């Protein structure tokens, strides 16, 4: 069984309000990584992100900071695509205080360009979470394994695969794919079966070799997320 870090996802609008800071502080013992979603901010700029990071850095000794721009293609709000998206991800490397950066994977990406950006982020001491999300369904087991395989070829620190289950076999397939690859990959693996049906993938992440599990602070930011306080309590049961 692997050690699991609990990620708390927040999605503020333009600024970090005092009420949000209070909510974070109230759950500080349950948070290992704070994920700052920025795709909900229309035409977000690096300067806006840097300003938010500055406010969060006051508490940063308590957790690592992960920045994520989730595109509409993968279930987020972000309108940036192609070079606009990749340029933003690349520019995040210049912000002090960011520990981890999410970058999306699709089957049709420009492999060389993606690899250059991932290497660039790592040169600035940012851990890379390469991720793929399917909010519609769970692909067959062999396809799940293939996605993990393709993502790990970029040599990131983490590979993350989140899919939507429609039955218990979908959940089992995701857990099996994660378990198999956690034994063979050099990088850390994250597998999430979304919605209430897949909740066990969040709470028993470490049993199946996963390294990160995602929860929320109040309002869920993805299907199946539960509050990080409850998530931390359940993760530690395993």
UniProtKB/Swiss-Prot annotation:
Family affiliation: Belongs to the type-I 3-dehydroquinase family.
Gene label: aroD
GO molecular function, one term: 3-dehydroquinate dehydratase activity
Subunit structure: Homodimer.
Top-level enzyme category: lyase
Active-site residues per Swiss-Prot or TrEMBL entry: 133 (proton donor/acceptor), 160 (schiff-base intermediate with substrate)
GO terms under biological process: 3,4-dihydroxybenzoate biosynthetic process; amino acid biosynthetic process; aromatic amino acid family biosynthetic process; chorismate biosynthetic process
Pfam families: DHquinase_I
The protein's name: 3-dehydroquinate dehydratase
Catalytic function, reaction form: 3-dehydroquinate = 3-dehydroshikimate + H2O
Metabolic or biological pathway: Metabolic intermediate biosynthesis; chorismate biosynthesis; chorismate from D-erythrose 4-phosphate and phosphoenolpyruvate: step 3/7
InterPro entries named among the record's database cross-references: Aldolase_TIM, DHquinase_I, Type-I_3-dehydroquinase
Entry EC number(s): 4.2.1.10
PANTHER family named in the record: 3-DEHYDROQUINATE DEHYDRATASE
Record: residues binding 3-dehydroquinate: 35-37, 70, 202, 225
Keywords of the record: Amino-acid biosynthesis, Aromatic amino acid biosynthesis, Lyase, Schiff base
Function in brief: Involved in the third step of the chorismate pathway, which leads to the biosynthesis of aromatic amino acids. Catalyzes the cis-dehydration of 3-dehydroquinate (DHQ) and introduces the first double bond of the aromatic ring to yield 3-dehydroshikimate.
Record field: transmembrane: none
């Amino acid at each position: 069984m692997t050690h699991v870090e609990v990620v708390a996802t927040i999605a503020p609008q333009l600024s970090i309000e005092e009420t949000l800071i209070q909510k974070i502080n109230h759950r500080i013992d349950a948070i290992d990584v704070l994920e700052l979603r920025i795709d909900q901010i229309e035409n977000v700029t690096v300067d806006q992100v840097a300003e938010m990071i500055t406010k969060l850095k006051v508490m940063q000794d308590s957790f690592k900071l992960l920045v994520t721009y989730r595109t509409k293609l993968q279930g987020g709000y972000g309108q940036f695509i192609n070079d606009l998206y990749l340029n933003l991800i690349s520019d995040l490397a210049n912000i002090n205080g960011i520990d981890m950066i999410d970058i999306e994977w699709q089957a049709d990406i420009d492999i060389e360009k993606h690899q250059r950006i991932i290497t660039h982020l790592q040169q600035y001491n940012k851990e890379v979470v390469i991720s793929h999300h399917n909010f519609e369904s769970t692909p067959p087991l062999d396809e799940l394994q293939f996605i993990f395989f393709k993502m790990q070829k970029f040599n990131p620190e983490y590979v993350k695969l989140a899919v939507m289950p429609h039955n218990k076999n979908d959940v089992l397939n995701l857990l099996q794919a994660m378990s198999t690859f956690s034994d063979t990959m050099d990088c850390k693996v994250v597998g999430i079966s979304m919605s209430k049906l897949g909740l066990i993938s969040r709470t028993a992440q470490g049993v199946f070799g996963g390294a990160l599990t995602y929860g929320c602070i109040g309002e869920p930011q993805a299907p199946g997320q539960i509050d990080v306080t409850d998530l931390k309590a359940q993760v530690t049961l395993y």
